[in-house]
From Swiss-Prot:
Recorded GO CC terms: cytoplasm
Active site: Y131
Enzyme class: hydrolase
Statement: the UniProt record of this protein carries the keyword Nuclease: yes
SUPFAM superfamilies assigned to the protein according to its UniProt record, in alphabetical order: Ribonuclease H-like
InterPro entries linked to this entry: Exonuclease_RNaseT/DNA_pol3, Oligoribonuclease, RNaseH-like_sf, RNaseH_sf
Subcellular locations according to the entry: Cytoplasm
The keyword Transmembrane appears for this protein: no
Lineage, highest ranks first: Bacteria, Pseudomonadati, Pseudomonadota, Gammaproteobacteria, Alteromonadales
Family: Belongs to the oligoribonuclease family.
Residue span(s) of domain Exonuclease: 10-173
Keyword list, A-Z: Cytoplasm, Exonuclease, Hydrolase, Nuclease
Function: 3'-to-5' exoribonuclease specific for small oligoribonucleotides.
The organism of origin for this protein: Idiomarina loihiensis (strain ATCC BAA-735 / DSM 15497 / L2-TR)
Protein name, per record: Oligoribonuclease
Length: 183
């Protein structure tokens, strides 16, 4: 692979958190996928449940308790040996095999939320990304307004599991590329 192609690679990330506020809530799962510029998956990173003390889990609202207990994530978090620092370091170690720091925008759905949590709880991982974002939810919002048929023709499963959510974000961007952008 040429250096130019390597510089076109994209890092996709998704987090699961105990809530929506980075100052009050915590990361409980992180996953990444690296794709080429054409959205072909090159590698799936480690899916890491991030240990959090029980006091943080006890502060989750009903939606988070139901969702993350139902998926088995709460149990994985309790059993995990990864704190936020170790999870960030392991993720960066994986990413360095495929792309240099500062090259890829942060890619995903509603990615600003993930970036907020990374900046607060995993600043080393947040700093690995370029400052730009590739946010699939921007295209979704535009499609809703400019071509609702395209927006409505992609259905998400809503698994709220980090790796599954990334795969779905990539598929959604492929959908918009095929149906929303004219060639």
């Amino acid at each position: 692979m040429t250096e130019d192609n390597k510089k076109q690679r994209l890092i996709w990330i998704d987090l699961e958190m105990t809530g929506l506020e980075p100052d009050e809530n915590h990361i409980i799962e992180v996953a990444t996928i690296v794709t080429d510029a054409q959205l072909n998956t090159l590698a799936e990173g480690p899916v890491i449940a991030v240990h959090q003390p029980q006091k943080h889990l006890d502060r989750m609202d009903d939606w988070n308790v139901k969702t993350h207990t139902g998926s088995g994530l709460v149990e994985r978090v309790k059993e995990s040996q990864h704190d936020e620092r170790k999870a960030a370091a392991e993720t960066i170690e994986f990413l360095r095999q495929y792309i240099d720091a500062g090259v890829s925008p942060m890619c995903g759905n509603s990615i600003c939320q993930d970036r907020r949590f990374l900046a607060k709880h995993m600043p080393e991982l947040e700093a690995f990304f370029h400052y730009r974002n590739l946010d699939v939810s921007t295209l979704k919002e535009l499609a809703k307004r400019w071509n609702p048929e395209v927006a409505n023709s992609f259905k998400k499963s809503g698994a709220h599991e980090a790796l599954a959510d990334i795969r779905e974000s990539i598929a959604e961007l492929q959908h918009y590329r095929e149906h929303f952008f004219s060639k």
